[in-house]
């Protein structure tokens, strides 16, 4: 048997407890865990490279920095199996990128070990990525894996891959429709449009839509500070979409500074004209009745509102997840205990990520508290939307 996901992406870190199904899988083959060897992709043994084939082995060994790629190998009386996992630092999931096995029994035994290790690490979920033409093995269905909502074909990493997830302990929640930003700078537009779509305004269609990118760029043009979307301009753009729809969606802007934002790298005229644009956005916000709440907003206040059903469009610092400091916009849409689910428009496809990494992305509240702060001195930008 060759149970396989495409040798493409990856993602990881975590919080939660293992499900009963996972426990039974681990208990039924306690010796399997003892026989599993964990190593880096650079250490692939010759016999596994031969079993995978040259092209597939090269995919296992591609550079996935900084997303913690690991290879797990099992040799047992029931057969041999190996899997590649990966995951973003400081998150609460592990992604199964590819699984090879010469028997169902070996594949199931290794999967049981991965589930147990994921739960022990504190993950909220173990994700599994599969090619569109591959089915989830029956034993994975029995263990509790369920399908992730199909994405809209958009950024690199949204095509050719299906996603499945096992929530340790279970987590019932609505999934947002995933759309990956198609430029380096449209994260704010995509985050806002994703949130509004979930509330019924459908800036993105329910099905693949060849006009989606045009709407992404149009929304960005209405909000941009060239090229980033700063909180005031983004709030104005969101307000205008809501107003045009005559819907009952509420918007609330929290930005705990009155100084210009996201201009840390600009000087001279490059900074001056962007400051002027932000002043125009501020005036437009006032003319529309958008109040800027400048009181500091705690992470507890954010997560409590998300837990109650609101969506939070968050300005974050990406460094904890990507080992590089960059401002970014994401949507927080569900909370369970001390874990928050994010919808992240960004996919680092060149390092093996796909939409499976960025959709329903669990992080701890403590890590989110660090991320929802950008600049020096730091400021916190949050736009709440809800019906």
Please place each PLM-identified region on the residue numbering.
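Active-site nucleophile-adjacent alpha helix/oxyanion-hole segment immediately C-terminal to the catalytic cysteine
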Residues: 167-228, 233-242
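Active-site acidic/histidine clusters and adjacent loop/turn architecture
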Residues: 258
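Conserved donor-binding loop and adjoining core beta-sheet/short helix segment
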Residues: 63-112
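Conserved catalytic-core motifs of GNAT/GCN5-like acyltransferases
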Residues: 146-160
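Acyl-donor binding region in acyl/amide transferases
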Residues: 91-144
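Short amphipathic alpha-helix that is part of the acyltransferase structural core
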Residues: 1-13, 27-61
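Noncatalytic regulatory segments and standalone regulatory/sensor domains
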Residues: 118, 122-123, 128, 133-139, ...
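Active-site-adjacent substructure of cysteine-protease-like catalytic cores
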Residues: 270-341
């Amino acid at each position: 048997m060759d149970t396989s996901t495409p040798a493409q992406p990856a993602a990881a870190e975590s919080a939660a407890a293992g499900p009963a199904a996972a426990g039974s899988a681990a208990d039924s083959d306690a010796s399997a865990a003892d026989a599993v060897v964990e190593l880096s992709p650079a250490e692939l043994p010759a016999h596994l490279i031969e079993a995978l084939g040259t092209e597939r082995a090269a995919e296992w060994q591609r550079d996935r920095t900084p997303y913690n790629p690991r290879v797990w190998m099992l040799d047992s009386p029931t057969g041999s199996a190996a899997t590649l996992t990966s995951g973003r630092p400081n998150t609460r999931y592990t992604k199964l990128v590819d699984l090879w096995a010469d028997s169902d029994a070996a594949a199931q035994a290794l999967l049981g070990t991965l589930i147990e290790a994921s739960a022990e690490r504190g993950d909220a979920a173990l994700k599994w990525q599969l090619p569109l033409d591959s089915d989830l093995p029956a034993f994975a269905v029995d263990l509790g894996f369920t399908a992730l909502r199909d994405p809209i074909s958009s950024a690199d990493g949204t095509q050719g891959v299906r996603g499945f997830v096992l929530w340790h302990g279970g987590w019932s929640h609505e999934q947002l429709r995933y759309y990956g930003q198609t430029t380096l700078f449209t994260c704010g537009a995509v985050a806002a449009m994703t949130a509004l779509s979930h509330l019924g305004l459908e800036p993105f269609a329910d099905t693949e839509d060849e006009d989606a990118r045009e709407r992404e760029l149009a929304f960005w043009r209405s909000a941009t500070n060239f090229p980033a979307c700063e909180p005031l301009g983004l709030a104005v753009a969101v307000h205008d979409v809501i107003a045009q729809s005559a819907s009952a969606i509420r918007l609330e802007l929290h930005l705990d500074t009155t100084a210009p934002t996201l201009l840390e790298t600009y000087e001279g005229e490059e900074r001056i004209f962007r400051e002027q644009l932000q002043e125009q956005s501020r005036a437009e916000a006032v003319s529309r009745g958008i109040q800027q709440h400048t009181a500091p907003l705690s992470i507890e206040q954010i997560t409590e509102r998300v837990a109650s059903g609101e969506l939070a469009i968050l300005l974050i610092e990406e460094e904890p997840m990507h080992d590089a400091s960059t401002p970014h916009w994401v949507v927080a849409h569900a909370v369970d205990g001390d874990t928050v689910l994010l919808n992240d428009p960004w996919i680092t496809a060149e390092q093996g990520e796909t939409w499976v990494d960025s959709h329903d992305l669990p992080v701890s509240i403590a890590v989110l508290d660090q991320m929802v702060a950008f600049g020096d001195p730091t400021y916190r930008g949050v736009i709440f939307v809800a019906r």
